[in-house]
């Protein structure tokens, strides 16, 4: 949540602007029932859609609508990331939003977007891949997966004619995240696999390794 200050020395019927500069909100996505056969992750292919939501509440005079202007941007980045493009995603509403040129983790508004009092603006974000996990994220302990994400907003907000003075509005950023599905992973796995010779069979392969997976066995022994 950030407070927008719409300042005007006299009552006006013109739009009044407020700047949003590097306003950061932190979110944690977690999953606590990951198979313990996965020891660590380098990357994970995922398939889930999260809604990035924007709404507002007023702390002083009545405001019925604010407008986030064309070019408003929202960056989504892993907390503490040291390599770029940790989050790979597509946008569900490409008519109104796009990926900012040269910044693969930044959503840019193609048009002005109104947020009316009591309503919520939703931006669907379809996540495809997560990679370059910072320390303490991904599989941070057996069976537990976590992402800590920074959402960083920049741009201009406006509101229609207001009385003289300082109009304060709280801009609220949030996310709606369903259950996260890890479709495939690159990393270290440590399943218990039984190998019987004559004929050669491999048994006890966990579900997540059964379909179209090639195994490189390092230092196998019988």
Predicted regions and their residues:
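Extracellular/secretory-pathway and virion-surface proteins
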Residues: 1-222
